[in-house]
Amino acid sequence: MRALRCSIIRGVAGLRMASSVLDEMKEQMLRRSKEDHKKIGDLRKKHGHEKLCDATIDAVYGGMRGITGLVYEPSLLDSAEGIRFRGLTILECQEMLPKAPGGKEPLPEAMFWLLMTGEVPTEEQARGLNAELHRRVDPEAIAAAQKAIAALPKNAHPMTAFSVGVLALQTYSKFAAAYAAGKSNKKTYWEYALEDSLDMLARTPAVAAMIYNRETKGQVELAAPSNSDLDWAANFAKMLGFQDEEFRECMRLYLSVHADHEGGNVSAHTTTLVASALSDPYLAFSAGLNGLAGPLHGLANQEVLKYLFSMQERVKADGVNVHDEAALEKALTKYTWELLNSGQVVPGYGHAVLRKVDPRYTCQRNFCLRHNFQDDLFKLVNTIYMIMPGILKEHGKTKNPYPNVDAHSGVLLQHYGLTEQNYYTVLFGLSRQMGVLAGVVWDRLQGRPLERPKSITTEMLAKKYLCNSL
């Protein structure tokens, strides 16, 4: 109760104490919302009866794949260009978003600004947002998460710890406190959702870093204290225990490109669905993390690494020199055909929507080339990249023979010594909160209702279609 009372006080006061950079963010959001409000009104008035898609029986039994049933503002997946963050491609984001001094990768806080407002922030706005996030770091809230994580069984998965940590932070929710106190309404829900989102973005890096130390050393604590002089990704890297500037750049890239991926994937849709019940952003994001923890969603890069390690063992056993490009290409071609002919798939290749090389893969590959990676794992993944599309086209059983983001992300982390594969999904979640929380705030800003689709039964379908066909 004490935490709830404190949250009520902070929640009501927090909106009055907004910094100038937060005022700028809100101003941009309100301006765009006003424009969208007119568009939405016109769309519903003039075209509300138009069909977006046909929901076939195959589709409802097939995980609703291909059914257009959601409006999600932060990003859109283009089958030709890949993910677009507020209309910008990955390459455009890399070129246009503010960077750290001397760096080439976008700052994740700049990406968050873009996802939240729809506008590219200035250097000053990106720095101001970083300062705002540092201001919101609350030792008391982080200590609550630390205590909750420390109470878990030793064999608890890092994603279990992350979800529990976020739920512990929830006791400081300004959205929940204001709602309980009767201080919020439909017109102000979005502001409290934004407050919670900023607080969460400020506090989850420390929670994630403590989980890493728990995984590597058995202690739920930071490897190094937070440093308010550093940007969001660099400070996270420091709390993990990595001091190398090149690794900081790696984290800026990794956390930026994984920030969002449209609204229909499990973690984004779960977060959106739970938040539609006016559950606060902490509850919603924790639910999204639980979806992300599923092996069909967040574990793909680990599957790729298992595949690469198995290839590495075969290459070694066959006496192939990974630095002999021709010999390596010949060996990997042989192994790949054996894999495909046995009925298995190549992890990291193919995509449900995209029909070209995933731009997120490309930017990671370019990072490795720019920093002159020479380790065996990169040699493997790079050679596979050169030969795989041709093999898969010849095999003829895939619509997209090109690599996706998961084909490379684990290789980056392995190179810098972050080898704990069970932890990788925590990094994914830390990044993905930027997109899904922006989506939650915009749902509240646009006044979206409780999500409640209609369900049917097999018996009902059988009576309607099978009985009439007999």
UniProtKB/Swiss-Prot annotation:
What's a Pfam family in this record?
A: Citrate_synt
The active site is formed by: 297, 351, 406
Q: Which reaction does it catalyse?
A: oxaloacetate + acetyl-CoA + H2O = citrate + CoA + H(+)
Alphabetic keyword roster: Mitochondrion, Transferase, Transit peptide, Tricarboxylic acid cycle
> Which Gene3D superfamilies does the record associate with it?
Citrate Synthase, domain 1, Cytochrome P450-Terp, domain 2
Q: Which CDD domains match?
A: ScCS-like
Subcellular location field? Mitochondrion matrix
What is one process in the GO biological process aspect for this record?
Answer: tricarboxylic acid cycle
User: Subunit details for this protein?
Assistant: Homodimer.
What more does the record tell us? Citrate synthase is found in nearly all cells capable of oxidative metabolism.
> Know the name of this protein?
Probable citrate synthase, mitochondrial
Whose protein is this, by species?
Leishmania infantum
